[in-house]
């Protein structure tokens, strides 16, 4: 009997925390489905979601100001367990009758937590033990406010030197608050603390497993599609590969794969993709030469959002034309959960678009194809697990992500054939050297960016004005946050030397040392 992977679910209310998506990843790792929603979501939506537990995220605001964000009051009245993290703890305390004040000394970074009452959340969990026999935990703090007075019915369950009320609980109503961040890796026991809340307190059954997700996806595809055909666009990336494999597993020969040669793919990528999918999928693959079409559509366009939307529209139009030839009604897309989150029009009721993904916000409103997105609920690492379970080669599964609009958004400003050719060569050199030096799988994503600016240099005995190439490499678990990769200077020097010597149009190479946030991983 197939498991209902959505039967037990956790709702995470986002107060604008940089770690909100990380909380969702941790809950998924525990094996329970969850969704992330803005903290001002309406009561009807929450009741329809019917969560087994609710987590209130941290946030950048202060509860001490009257106009800042609050949790929906009714969540404290429906008998559902609630866990407040950092700001989430503070707003829960304030809303239930406690007091919150600015702290005399803000806590940022490592702290040692002394557990006063281990019941429920901290049961059996410790990093060390104090001389008095109390459990001690290493935790990560990031706050300027503290709960100064507990709400009625609560007791202090942990403290630090700077936070006498570092954790609190109302055991009867199953309300819990943590001033620290259990979701980050700097809190070593954080996963176990969250598991105690999700499994023991909320009593969720961990049905969110790779095997069950595949079974559920196949059933869903079969029910939606019936006997109709599906087109899936291949890009060479893991998302489209897993999408195609899932759809093929569900409906077999009803799948037609389409590889659109936009002229914006990486060097030799068209041949590589055709080889992989004809060999491993055994599915029908149609390659459409759309280079001239994309270049014409992108001519004169320098705005990144416009480039993304144009790429999305051209992709869909190509697929629709192929679909009409084949009488296909469905388009399979490799949309994943971070695409959905980043393309949301608002965050916490007042956010801004981070960027429009060509397979989410960039789809034309008058699209004639019906859409099927089997990965829409999954994070990138979950997609990779699915791919391995489905038997795709590891080299493909762990290939670095590549944006749908391709090199169009790795060329700053307007796109033209000269810029594309230069960027393809520079990117290929960077990736080749990463693989030769065994750094490729030590970083999560790496690529080159073309800057349409000329910088003076010297080649031979003459002054030379050439273009600038930026190199970007990051390390990340979920692509929601990322750290720039501290690659050895000798390695970067070698890559730079090759690029400026092998590509005559380039005179300068720079390396991007910016984390996400504040930057995004892609430059556009």
From Swiss-Prot:
One of its GO terms (molecular function) is ATP binding. Residues 9-207 form the Glutamine amidotransferase type-1 domain. The active site is at 86 (nucleophile), 181, 183. It catalyses: XMP + L-glutamine + ATP + H2O = GMP + L-glutamate + AMP + diphosphate + 2 H(+). It is an enzyme of class 6 (ligase). Residues 208-399 form the GMPS ATP-PPase domain. ATP binds at residues 235-241. Pathway: Purine metabolism; GMP biosynthesis; GMP from XMP (L-Gln route): step 1/1. Keywords: ATP-binding, Glutamine amidotransferase, GMP biosynthesis, Ligase, Nucleotide-binding, Purine biosynthesis. InterPro entries: Class_I_gatase-like, GATASE, GMP_synth_C, GMP_synth_GATase, GMP_synthase, GMPS_ATP_PPase_dom, NAD/GMP_synthase, Rossmann-like_a/b/a_fold. Its EC number is 6.3.5.2. Catalyzes the synthesis of GMP from XMP. Homodimer. This is GMP synthase [glutamine-hydrolyzing]. The gene is guaA.
